Amino acid sequence: MSTPSLAREVAEDTVRHWYSAECNTQAAARRMRFSRQTVQSRLERAKQLFPEMFIEANNSPSHEWTLPQFHEIEIDNGTVLIGSDAHIWPHNETIMMKAFARLSKELKPRVIVLNGDILDGARVSRHGSLLGQNAPKLTAEINAAHQWIDTLYKPAERVWTMGNHDQRVDNYLANNAPELDDYAGRLSDRFPQWKFCWATMINNLEVRHRFRSGIHAGWNSALHSGISTVTGHTHQLQVTAVRNRNGTHWGIECGMLGDPSHKAFEYAEGSTSRAQSGFVVVTFRNGIMMPPETVELIDGRPVFRGNWIV
């Protein structure tokens, strides 16, 4: 039986999307807006007609991005624990960081996402320092992050979406000592058990450090994405429903694991803000996302489902 024809241009485009999606057929199909069966069929035909495409793509030094654009995860049943913006300094494990660790061991989530800005990168910032602030060295921040991360439950899927403060580490090296990049390594090399990426797609939920900003960041992120989103960066903790003829999806901002009053944020001069310590729990049932839940400080203690955690 002869192999069905497939245009070279179509094959090249399919193979490119497949490698860009880390050889995940479902993820490639989502990006191409085709069915999984269509993409799988095209890949099978491409392997028969143009096997050299796979060799060339596999041997290429880079697939366009320094980090994966998306890390795709499929869940039928289970929970996802998402926290961001710890802005870790040494000897400063906040009550919300402790609550995140404790709840991770109670819920035993399928996925833990550290949604960016886990490090602060105070001494490798492009912004000037405050006189007498005595910001910690980067190595001290990394060591403190390791100590806290070691207290977390360890699911198979551990994802770290890159935040702008996390980027300070690699950006400093790239701009000040690029000839040492292979020697010094990336931030991801310091945390090899974690999957570093710009965003992760969990079923039809997009988790990334930042997208829209402002007081309505959650709403606008979900509205313009067209799907449920979880973002950090703003330090706001809130859940906003976007409802239309297609149903409901959610714009979720996951607060911060750090302390808004810590000296790392002295640049804000102590003014009132919407920053709120907290994090997010998302549950899936039969592949469907349930309404998201938050953990936040009530009277100085973290609360989840009406109960104190710490």
Residue ranges: model-predicted function:
Residues 5-23:
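Short, amphipathic alpha-helical "recognition" segments used to contact nucleic acids or chromatin
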